[in-house]
């Protein structure tokens, strides 16, 4: 399984990845996401394999040997690159390509989109809710993460601060910044995503934008309020029994 993409993209596709487990099972992902894949026999970063060099320069023999050793390769990597698909075909590598993102005009939730892609290849049925196991006791604090991968998806910071003042009457509030987020005074910043997941799993409440960290909080079972602006929650909202979504506009 080769799954590029940001934090949220990986998390939304976890049910599809897990449904394909059979025999020996490797998952190749973006380096930062590797610690979030807990179910594979082996997890590798795409960069460490040399796959990103395939089609650009002569690939290392170890990469071709590794790819040739698999009976099947399910890839969201290179799906929109005809030259990459042609190259792996010429090498007789057993690739099955799938689009990495749902269509822009689509209405199907992203997790269902990924599950639907692999349905004919599934070794088992899968829970359509992304889950990352974290055995962490719940504590009495709220987390606010005011960032995302795009400024247009961010609820204004002053409104988050106003919300925090209200929440502080009920419980302590801790601010959170992800590994790629800008500086924020007093924010907890944990670079390892699984360790960040464990910290989020201890929160009584999480509030954030349409972001990978919001998907991470939902996947560990923390009660989540996800604030959506221009993106479509019907496609991109986090899933889980403890997730609530609110829409905002400026």
What are these regions (language model features)?
Residues 1-250:
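Catalytic machinery of carbohydrate-active enzymes
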């Amino acid at each position: 399984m080769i799954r590029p993409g940001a934090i949220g993209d990986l998390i939304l596709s976890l049910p599809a990845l897990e449904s394909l487990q059979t025999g020996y099972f490797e998952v190749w992902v973006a380096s930062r996401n590797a610690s979030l894949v807990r179910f594979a026999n082996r997890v590798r970063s795409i960069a460490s394999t040399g796959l990103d060099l395939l089609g650009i320069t002569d690939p290392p023999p170890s990469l071709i040997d590794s790819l040739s050793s698999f009976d099947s390769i399910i890839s969201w990597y290179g799906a929109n690159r005809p030259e990459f698909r042609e190259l792996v075909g010429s090498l007789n590598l057993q690739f099955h390509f799938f689009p990495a993102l749902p269509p822009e005009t689509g209405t199907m939730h992203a997790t269902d989109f990924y599950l639907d892609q692999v349905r004919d290849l599934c070794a088992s049925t899968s829970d359509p809710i992304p889950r990352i196991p974290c055995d962490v006791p719940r504590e009495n604090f709220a987390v606010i993460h005011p960032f995302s991968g795009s400024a247009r998806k961010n609820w204004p910071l002053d409104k988050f601060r106003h919300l925090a003042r209200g929440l502080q009457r009920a419980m302590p509030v801790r601010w959170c910044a992800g590994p790629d987020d800008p500086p924020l005074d007093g924010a907890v910043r944990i670079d390892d995503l699984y360790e960040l997941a464990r910290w989020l799993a201890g929160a009584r409440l999480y509030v954030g934008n349409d972001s990978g960290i919001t998907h991470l909080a939902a996947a560990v079972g923390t009660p989540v309020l996800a604030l959506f602006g221009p993106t479509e929650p019907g496609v991109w909202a986090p899933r889980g029994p403890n997730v609530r979504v609110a829409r905002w506009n400026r």
